[in-house]
Amino acid sequence: MGEEDVQALVVDNGSGNVKAGVAGDDAPRSVFPSIVGRPKNPGIMVGMEEKDAFVGDEAQTKRGILTLKYPIEHGIVTNWDDMEKIWHHTFYNELRAAPEEHPVLLTEAPLNPKGNRERMTQIMFESFNVPAMYVAIQAVLSLYSSGRTTGIVLDSGDGVSHTVPIYEGYALPHAIMRLDLAGRDLTEYLMKILHERGYGFSTSAEKEIVRDIKEKLCYIALNFDEEMKTSEQSSDIEKSYELPDGNIITVGNERFRCPEALFQPSFLGKEAAGIHTTTFNSIKKCDVDIRKDLYGNIVLSGGTTMYEGIGERLTRDITTLAPSTMKIKVVAPPERKYSVWIGGSILSSLSTFQQMWITKEEYDESGPSIVHRKCF
């Protein structure tokens, strides 16, 4: 195959957003919500093309009359029919590229069940007829995009958070930690604490409004207890937000109480350790000789690491846990919302990567299990 002249397509399937584009670009051409919406009462949508499903932004704009579903939960695909719709939309509507003409690089969550990546492989070759494909682990791509091959990635998106120690380009599976606490949980928690203020948000459409409030107004306190005290004494941290109907609501200490759950999951009724402790535990599971390299290269990735104040707070909390002489460095690249995609763009453009693709011939010969031999 003359793969040199054909650009690969890179698709990062997140629980919240799909990031898609062409290898070699420095940013995804298309970012849209991983949503499939179906009419609440079929037959109601007069004068609109009778579609049984809407994907992405179109589902978002018509959300009032649709039931919205996310086919990826906690980083793992739970509804393959909807997932196929999302991929179809990605290739044909967003990228306007025929998948049978391009190698496709997909991403997956660390510790993804084996059956999941086999199913991805099968759909790509059998439904979309791709000439070649590859499945890469999201956190490893984020590290590549930061220009490193060794470090620990704290990747937190909409559906799941992971800490993934990587040494010389290889993830260390025994030390990967997974935390089922990410952006979607924080949005739900913000809905809950806004309820206590008397603002009732409940439908799937209203949840999207709360997500927007979270992204625009929330931040992480360096010291939570002190911030709470300050917020009780003054109204400086109060901000107003205009709802789509023109009403204005006021958001106060919810601004930092919401993302505090990343450090204190007990706020959500979860027994898990916070992201600082999880990162520390992940490093402790690694060989003592490489820990220094990991402590000095803690790389943030994913939309849920975009809160103001997260780098300072993590540095402080991990310094408290780590050996006292250890130098702690948290790296927060400005483009970290898309660093998984950027890493995929870099990887699939490398000349050395071209022999890594799983080709159609190999798939026909070995079946879906080929993915475990070629993608690691």
From Swiss-Prot:
Classification via SUPFAM superfamilies: Actin-like ATPase domain
Pfam family, one: Actin
Enzyme class: hydrolase
Record's keyword annotation contains Lipoprotein: no
SMART domains noted in UniProt: ACTIN
Impact reported for A272C: 5-fold increase in inorganic phosphate (Pi) release in presence of Mg(2+)
PROSITE patterns hit by this protein: ACTINS_1, ACTINS_2, ACTINS_ACT_LIKE
Reported regulation of activity: ATP hydrolysis occurs in the polymeric state. Unlike for mammalian actin, ATP hydrolysis occurs also in the monomeric form and the release of inorganic phosphate (Pi) is more efficient.
A single GO molecular function term of this UniProt record: structural constituent of cytoskeleton
Disruption of the gene: reported phenotype: Conditional knockout at the ring stage results in the production of merozoites; however, these merozoites fail to start a new infection cycle due to a failure to invade new host erythrocytes. During schizogony, daughter merozoite development and segmentation is abnormal and is characterized by the presence of aberrant membranous pockets adjacent to the food vacuole. Apicoplasts have few branches and collapse close to the food vacuole failing to migrate to individual daughter cells.
Impact after mutating E49G: Increases inorganic phosphate (Pi) release in presence of Mg(2+). No effect of K(+) on Pi release. No effect on Pi release in absence or in presence of K(+)
Documented EC number(s): 3.6.4.-
Top-level taxonomic group: Eukaryota
An example Gene Ontology CC term for this record: actin cytoskeleton
Catalysed reactions, as listed in the record: ATP + H2O = ADP + phosphate + H(+)
DNAseI-binding D loop: annotated span: 40-61
BP GO annotations: cytoskeleton organization; entry into host cell by a symbiont-containing vacuole; plastid inheritance; schizogony; symbiont-mediated actin polymerization-dependent cell-to-cell migration in host
Swiss-Prot/TrEMBL keywords: ATP-binding, Cytoplasm, Cytoskeleton, Hydrolase, Nucleotide-binding, Nucleus
Amino-acid positions noted as binding ATP in the UniProt annotation, renumbered to this chain: S15, G16, N17, K19, D158, G159, V160, K214, E215, G303
Compartments where found: Cytoplasm; Nucleus; Cytoplasm, Cytoskeleton
Site (Not methylated): H74
Family of this protein: Belongs to the actin family.
Subunit structure: Monomer (G-actin). Oligomer (F-actin). Polymerization of globular actin (G-actin) leads to a structural filament (F-actin) in the form of a two-stranded helix. Unlike for mammalian monomeric actin, parasite monomeric actin is able to induce oligomerization in the presence of ATP or ADP. Mg(2+), which is used to coordinate ATP, is required for polymerization. Interacts with MyoA. Interacts with DNase I with low affinity.
Job of this protein: Actin is a highly conserved protein that polymerizes to produce filaments that form cross-linked networks in the cytoplasm. Polymerizes into shorter and less stable actin filaments compared to ACT2/actin-2; this is thought to facilitate gliding motility and host cell invasion. Has ATPase activity. ATP hydrolysis leads to the formation of a stable intermediate ADP-inorganic phosphate (Pi) actin, which is followed by the release of Pi. ATP hydrolysis affects filament stability; ADP-bound actin depolymerizes much faster than ATP- or ADP-Pi-bound actin.
Miscellaneous comment as given in the Swiss-Prot or TrEMBL entry: A potassium ion appears to reside in the active site during hydrolysis and leaves together with the inorganic phosphate Pi. K(+) does not activate Pi release; however, it may be relevant for ATP hydrolysis.
Name of the protein: Actin-1
